[in-house]
């Protein structure tokens, strides 16, 4: 566990400045807000056309992901700025403030990764089992799955309030999170369980993305043989619309880069918890703070990944690549676009 110098610190170290926190807060608000505007414009554009089930579900999941990131930023970042303004650590405001901040950080890290997992699973199921997907999966599933994920994440992150796990303050006094190096076995079990859940989600997302790549390659091979635009399921024409391969590539690219960001932001925390469990319990404020910073910037980077990988940007890249391909394969036809 953290020693008294950080765990019960009353004032913020003067060497730390609120500028990075303020920049992160502004970038998170602006980025997530802009991403929501782009999503709404696409939704209205899509409403003018015949809807596609998989696009509607994907749109809802991505919107939920962006809204969750925005909410997490709004609920956590202002507390840090207030702490800097009063030069008072979270624990010295009130212990409940530290517990609230720890819950917020833990909850939004878990729910965001869970939503990305659901999005990757949606693409995996859509391409791997298109007939079943078209018959049984609709956007209504999102209104069932998303609340269930929120309920599970909430209950799990409330456990430290019932003495299974604990939220503690980290240097410089503006961070609270689960105790990554606890002495009590029940608190250590909770930290390991949290890290394991995060690791399993990340690995599962990577596997799903690999499966989607495999299915896209098979679609590409079939298209080369047939010489026509690929469809997800020809035998279910009454239930399915034509879906260009470019649309699936766009979805894959978005999920892939978001997964990379999550891996980079999550692994330091997972490694830190496991090292504390297997090591000699020596604390390292620098490593703890590094892990917390990585996990916190995820909600800031996510919307910018979405913005930079909007269809117009992706199409520009894809058609640029296609111009360099041979005329025999005519890859430009492969990327016939249908807006999300």
Model-derived features: where do they sit?
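Loop architecture of class A 7-transmembrane GPCRs
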Residues: 2-10, 87-106, 155-200
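Fourth transmembrane helix
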Residues: 111-118, 125, 131-175, 200-207
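Helix-to-loop junction signature of class
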Residues: 21, 25, 38-40, 71-88, ...
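Intracellular effector-coupling site of seven-transmembrane GPCRs
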Residues: 48-68, 214-269
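Extracellular TM2-ECL1-early TM3 structural module of rhodopsin-like
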Residues: 14-22, 54-119, 126-129, 133-134
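Seventh transmembrane helix
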Residues: 264, 270-274, 289-336, 340
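Cytoplasm-facing ends of alpha-helical transmembrane segments in multi-pass membrane proteins
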Residues: 29-43, 66, 73-80, 107-131, ...
